[in-house]
Amino acid sequence: MKTATLLAALSVLAGALAAPLAGDSALHRRSLPRLGGVNLAGCDFGIDIYGNSGTPACPGTEQVGHFIADGANLFRLPAGWQYLVGNNQASTSLAPDFFAQYDALVQAVISKGAYAIIDVHNYARWNGAIIGQGGPSNQDFANLWTLLATKVTSNDPNVIFGLMNEPHDLDVSTWAGSVQAAVNAIRAAGATSQYILIPGTGFTNANAWFQGQDNALLGVTDPVGGTDKLLLDVHRYNDVDFSGTHAECTTNSLDVLSSLDSWLKGNGRKAIVSETGGGHTTSCETDLGEFLNGIKEDYPSVLGFAVWAAGSFDPSYVLSITPTNGVDNQLFDIAVKPNLP
């Protein structure tokens, strides 16, 4: 959203998933279930929309079990690029202390059979400069994903790679080349069974996909073949300017969801709404609930959602769904929980 806001696998499974994916692996062919859950924010705190960094505040793992008990099976885990690599964009290693905190979240999620989205929350930027467009090189971006794909997965199929949070104000054709470099790096690192979220422009807004602004990104290819593992990343907020910064909702966005669903079917693609949310108001209890129900009904074109946000957010934050003393707030109980898988 537009504010400041990894692995032991059974060796048999890892070996099976690392095998060539020519079409005879049942795990490779399996479809994702209907997904629903939350963003656990904090490891991204201090990152602004220009990719400048501040001070992270990674949450503990206790909320993972809490939300799984509620019915969640998807956790998006935002992290700042600078924090992951010790503020060195060309680093050949991950920052050990920070990554240990982040990896604990990933492990907590996948150990319970849920899905973890690894989200680099930098708005396609590093300290104000755009990836591949005057800022970090595509190789720097690819190196980051090589490190993450190597460290995070052990080829665990419950990891989903969210390449970049909310790119904006950039050349989309050039950005498609940066995205392709990251996809290639992930696959070359041996992470061949995981899904990858392709981030669109305009803060990953839904309209940019079906209105054609993101057409260049449809040309991104997967070295393992096909496009079934390349999911489209979508964000949608229902406040007056769709920014996710206001307490009141003014639409349920079902018209946008219908257009997206039709477009996805027409193009043979699938998407995840990795950010949406609402304020602690009656309008958002209604509109967010209707929107999430619409996502549920649009499965499998739209595979699911992750609501913004819990984790290290104080319960008083305008879009908070952080539980208080283990108790969910009213927005979560009314709008989110009934639409979880």
From Swiss-Prot:
It catalyses: Endohydrolysis of (1->4)-beta-D-glucosidic linkages in cellulose, lichenin and cereal beta-D-glucans. Residues 17-30 form a propeptide. InterPro entries: Glyco_hydro_5, Glyco_hydro_5_CS, Glycoside_hydrolase_SF. Residues 1-16 form the signal peptide. It is an enzyme of class 3 (hydrolase). It holds the Pfam family Cellulase. The active site is at E166 (proton donor), E275 (nucleophile). The keyword 4Fe-4S does not apply. Keywords: Carbohydrate metabolism, Cellulose degradation, Cleavage on pair of basic residues, Glycosidase, Hydrolase, Polysaccharide degradation, Signal. Its EC number is 3.2.1.4. The keyword Isomerase does not apply. GO terms for biological process: cellulose catabolic process. SUPFAM superfamilies: (Trans)glycosidases. One of its GO terms (molecular function) is cellulase activity. Has endoglucanase activity on carboxymethyl-cellulose (CMC). Belongs to the glycosyl hydrolase 5 (cellulase A) family. This is Endoglucanase 1. It comes from Saitozyma flava (Cryptococcus flavus). The lineage of its organism: Eukaryota, Fungi, Dikarya, Basidiomycota, Agaricomycotina. The gene is CMC1.
